[in-house]
């Protein structure tokens, strides 16, 4: 099976992936999400300049250990960002070349505009969203106007502690079905020990 381009993102219940100014402080964390297991499903991550700058604004230079990070930008200088590939090429052509190589899946990280462009080009294979129990009322939408696709639900997980609902969809016509949600840790089931029965009282023998 060829590599899949998977769009994975957190989204509010009313369909926004960021606040009006790119804010991400509304994202809810849940200890059941195993990020190390999630990252092992990919060896390449791609994003646009805006998403990259929001990521680096929190510290660091955006490099991810064990992953090839590809950033599409016409203004960033490659020499300034070690460990990251800054490209000015057409993202559609780059994605097609990446998918032709051997390796794990490719993560399309954030960025509604890039998602719309690549979706319209027919190179996105899955849509995997973590729906947060949050209403923003305004912000950057999951999918700007201009692209449509039919989806098929592959898996879903509900995280009771936080109220997050994780949904994994295949895009019909894509390269294979979407994966099951394996990076959510199973709920721990504690076996209840049966209470020990009280010791039976010995009957006293009657004296003759």
Predicted feature residues:
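Enzymes that bind and transform nitrogen-containing heteroaromatic metabolites
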Residues: 1-208
């Amino acid at each position: 099976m060829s590599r899949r381009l998977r769009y994975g993102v957190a989204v509010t219940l009313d369909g926004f992936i960021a606040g009006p100014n790119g804010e991400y402080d509304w994202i809810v964390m849940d200890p059941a999400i195993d990020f190390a297991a999630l990252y092992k499903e990919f060896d390449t991550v791609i994003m646009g300049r805006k998403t990259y700058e929001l990521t680096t604004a929190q510290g660091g230079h955006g490099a991810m250990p064990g992953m090839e990070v590809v950033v599409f930008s016409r203004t960033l200088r490659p020499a300034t960002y070690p460990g990251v590939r800054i490209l000015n090429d057409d993202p559609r052509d780059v994605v097609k070349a990446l998918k032709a190589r051997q390796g794990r899946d490719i993560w399309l990280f954030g960025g509604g505009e890039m998602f719309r462009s690549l979706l319209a080009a027919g190179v996105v294979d899955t849509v995997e969203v973590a729906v947060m129990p949050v209403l923003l009322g305004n912000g950057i939408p999951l999918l700007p106007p201009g692209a449509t696709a039919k989806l098929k639900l592959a898996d879903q997980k509900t995280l009771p502690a936080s109220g997050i609902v994780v949904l994994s969809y295949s895009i019909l016509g894509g390269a294979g079905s979407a994966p099951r949600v394996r990076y959510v840790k199973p709920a721990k089931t504690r076996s209840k020990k049966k209470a020990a029965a009280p010791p039976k009282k010995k009957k006293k023998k009657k004296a003759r």
